[in-house]
């Protein structure tokens, strides 16, 4: 019997071919590693051939990174402004810095004659951002928000009010019924130096929409048999009457009084009607003829009395369980609020408040 000595498929021949291929790949990887090492070494010595300045630069120049700009486009912008010697100087420096992908659109305060490394480092520093900040605390009425927005952006109050008059086209929800009070969401905003009044108003309304979506405002309001506007109004009452830790209990008081057909009798609503912020109101003030005066008018006021935050919106949709009908800030200086179910207990709490108020 004879045997065929020709190697079969998968025998030693192909195995030797795979070994050769692996050897080639290993060699290529080694060459790439050597190349990268040489580049990094040359770059550290400043002899890569890329035009680059040395040092931190001097003077001041503002550059703008547009939305969607690539690192190459940012580099070109910097080079055109004289910040870096070439776009490649910035791009190569950015490639060596993983955080460079976080460079966001906006205006940056840079210096002329910077090295690529220095330019990347400065752009990653939040302090280099040229922005106009507007801080709107929770519970502010829209007049204060307009004043703060004017001061922070340099825009006139008149131009901001003109934009507010067109809020329906800038994102004001239809259920707001044209009333901007309560819908300029409290937050800290950052705007570009050339921001317009429309953009300021739109940003605040958009932020409200985000908060409303987060709490599922419209659907959950409907579950309670309320409109979204009524829930925002309740949230503004919580914001104006109590501290965050008491929001849910005050919300329960509101619901209980509405169910009993009792007037809410909230000082915050009278203050809103009068444009004041008094801790104690006179009889004349309490007799103010206004649909916002919840001493005279039963039910909720026509709309929000300030801009509530998300915690107040949540509490308005999630009142605590309880039978309270009254609450009194018995010790405002220390943030103490107490609750009562009977009128007699309420009177006792009121006496405690008067004693603490002096």
Describe every region a protein language model picked out.
Residues 42-212:
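Signal peptide-directed extracytoplasmic domains
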